[in-house]
Amino acid sequence: IRRQRQMCIRDRRRTVIALKNNILYDLALAPNVEVELPVGQRWSLNMEYKCPWWSNSKHGFCYQLLSGGVEARCWLGKRKNRERLTGHFLGIYAEGGVYDFQFDKDKGYRGNYYAASGLTYGYSHQLARHLVLEFSLGIGYLATEYRKYTTYEGDLIWTSSGRYHFMGPTKAKISLVWLIKGRRR
């Protein structure tokens, strides 16, 4: 804690933007990027985008997801001597996207749209002047309409459709964050 306070006291430049990458999405082979903008000392706006777009029709594999989201965050605790975008936070989020998942040659699921919203809790720990490690978990509601399909002689045949609703954990993050500083205070 003392080291963090010393870093904040030494560096009087404000964080104007943060660029992020969720390591958990990377492990799932899902390229992603996030941008977070501080709004004063206590609030911030986080935007995210993920886009794994992998397919191999020869092996009956498709892993495609195009998704975006936005989250408003409130940073907790005393903020006077703290670096922006560090510490504990609560957030409210909404995201949506399209998907197509096929993990074997027999069947797959395609969603024209999915939507999720909920609340997050997280903690951002400053590792260096410009580097932060962020942990967060989102709990909320997810809804989608999907089409189940099977393949026949290389063509996709729609077999059924349905709706899926889920209440519970909808988001988990371990992110590397790069703080970009602006002018001096």
Residues covered by each model-derived region:
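Glycine- and aromatic-enriched membrane insertion/assembly motifs of diderm outer-membrane
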Residues: 18-100
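Extracellular/periplasm-exposed beta-strand and loop segments of Gram-negative cell-envelope proteins
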Residues: 22, 49-65, 98-114, 144-153, ...
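Residues that define the transmembrane beta-barrel architecture of outer-membrane proteins
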Residues: 1, 15-17, 27-31, 62-68, ...
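Residue-level signature of outer-membrane beta-barrel architecture
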Residues: 25, 37, 74-76, 123-125, ...
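Membrane-embedded beta-strands of outer-membrane beta-barrel proteins
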Residues: 33, 70, 119-121, 137, ...
